[in-house]
Amino acid sequence: LVEKVNQFIRFNLPRGTFFEGVFALIDFKEDTVYYINCAVPAFFLYNRAYNNIMEIQGEGHVLGFVKDISPYIKVKKVKLNPGDILFACTDGVLDSKSLRGEPFGKDRLQKSIIENTMLPAQNMASTSYNALLEFLSKELDDDVSIFTLKMLRA
């Protein structure tokens, strides 16, 4: 699938068009997520048991840049426990700058995640987005995508 998406971008969209993204498959029997990170700059796992966040980036490559992406595809996996959260976002979140020229960055994003772990996944994403908008005090200069997955069952 990753190779087909890469080929489509490379050969059907305007030259110089690139995409970042995460491809994931969830094994509900094993509570495991298998994923390929294609250049998403912020991919985090919140561990409820330890109340901490760690980056689980992977070694992916931006889509549409090379003809053959297969050498760059690395499947990673992470086991999820009840209350654990996967959170990913594009560079539009991290790199957006305030009026003073300060980027929102990973620290502010992680703080927003930790402060809102009790919310449903959809509300976590919108709360992080609203924190970004409040920080910027202006319109966004870049596109923003946020993905949140929360493990609810044992």
Question: Where do the language-model regions lie?
Answer:
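Conserved subregion of the PPM/PP2C metallophosphatase catalytic domain
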Residues: 1-154
